[in-house]
Amino acid sequence: SETAAELWGVDGVSLVKRLTGGTAFADVAVDDSIAAGSRELVVGASLNGKLFLAYDSSVDRLHVYDPQLGTPRVRRVSLATPAAPTVANTGAGAYAATIRYYRVRWIQLNSGVEVRRSEAGASVTFTPSGSGTHARITQPAVAGEGETHWAIEASEDNASFYVLTEPATATTTYDDNETVADYSEE
């Protein structure tokens, strides 16, 4: 609607500002600053209640103003791709020595609703020793882009992956004791 209209601008020192229903521009928090000398090349498009901004910055990613965030700001679109997790044997028992593959994705939830999800990171190949009870998957270093959870995916063929669980990022390990045949039933 016209009452929700906003005017956006970039000033001479690449500060992003917005005018909404008033007469004064307000500064907008920006995760990645606009590169010097390229402020006149900022391009924006509104979609689904957000303002997407394409501009030159130190990070080669599209940006978006998301008014639904707890602290509205211009953030990167999507999340950084995670590194591969590490996997090790744990416990004493008879966990089958069958080759399997693990990979992870970052997820950001806001009030239980998924806001964004990263691309899958590289997979890691793991064959249990046969004398443990679980394969312990350890989270890679968190990207620090607002991710709240991580999806742990497993595969028996390194092609078809299935989500095992999506714990909060504060939970840094997960113990998998499923057989590879059960992955597709998760």
What are the functions of these language-model segments?
Residues 1-12:
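Beta-strand-rich domains and repeat architectures in extracellular enzymes and scaffolds
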Residues 17, 22-186:
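Disordered, low-complexity "stalk" and linker segments at domain junctions of extracellular
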